[in-house]
Amino acid sequence: MGKVLIKCIQTPMQKYFYDRSLDSVVMVNDEEYQILKTVEKTKLVPDGVLRRFVKSGLLRETAIEEIEHPETENLHLLAEHYMGNLILQVTQQCNLRCKYCAYSGNYYNRSHTSNRMDFETAKKAIDFYLKRSEKADQLALSFYGGEPLLEFELIKKCVSYILQRKGDKKILFTMTTNGTLMTEDVIEFLVKYEFNLMISLDGDKKSHDINRRFKTGKGSFDIILENLSRLKAYNEEYYSKVLFNCVISSSSDLENIYRFYSEEELFEAGTVNFNYVNPVGLKDETLSRITQKNFRVHRLAYIKMILSVLEKRKWDAQSRLLRRELQDIELLYEPVSYTHLTLPTILRV
């Protein structure tokens, strides 16, 4: 027998393998799983074993010699002429010390540093990008940190520099910020250049401040709400497009968070993303633990949202909050139309 392609899968309760030839997932016992792990690695089925699978049409020899992306042949063209977005990490510094931050020291990777980007480096990156996006329909420049607004002067220089060199192409500016450094000058700048803005806010004061604190240990909720009020007063139309990112940790009270975003007049349905603490590489696993209460609250709200989409119940503030959770699915799957064919009972040839 030639080479076969399978993928072994283990869950807390059972063991399986995925068979490419029949596009099937098959449950197996412990002994079979160990043999299949070897098959997965060697791509060869030992003689005289796993006969019941072979008889069922599984573990067939594959005719595939190589798998590649449909755009593989165009990669060079895309990279050299259609580069879509430039992300500048303008600093690795941050004025907050959030417990679940990827750079907090609670993950097995780098922690916050004093590294910052200088303007010469930024110019080289922008020049590199402009040279390789000449055939793109529009440009996109994003600023990332740390906390990017610690380098507000650099960001202003970068925006000015790319605007002078972009030609007649449209450009989108994007930034994710913790919302604590939004002075009047910053607000005026963001509105002027129509930044796509995402602000981190973990719901009500108690839920937010337990994780998102300044270096001194003081919570950041109050100053963020003050800045949001100032931004909304400055330009309400711009503010209506601002997005918010809410991270749920084991210490969060999801019921209070939903209530806060539903009732606080600063927020509209559809502007809040809800995420859980990333458990990958996390040293303190308790931070990412989902409590039973939070699980029940989220599932109930999600079911309400689905029923509202299906027009089985009226929309309420909470179900509107979760409407964004369907957007990823809607972006992936376009509506498909099906044609039903009625075949004759007897086919004459």
Model features per residue range: what roles?
Residues K37-L44:
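Short helix-coil junctions and helix-kink-helix linkers
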Residues K206, N211-L225, S229-L341:
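Radical SAM enzyme [4Fe-4S]-AdoMet core and its adjacent flexible, acidic
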Residues T72-E188, K192-Y193:
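Conserved alpha-helical substructure of the radical SAM core
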Residues H340-V349:
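Single conserved hydrophobic/aromatic residue that forms the stacking wall/gate
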Residues Y107-Y108, P148-L150, G179-E184, N196-K218, ...:
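Conserved radical SAM core fold
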Residues K3-V4, C8-P12, Y16-Y33, R320-L341:
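Accessory C-terminal segments flanking Radical SAM cores
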Residues Q138-S142, L172-T174, N196-M198, K241-L243, ...:
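Structural preference for beta-strand elements that scaffold enzyme active sites
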Residues K3-Y18, L22, V26-M27, D47-I87, ...:
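N-terminal [4Fe-4S]-dependent radical SAM core
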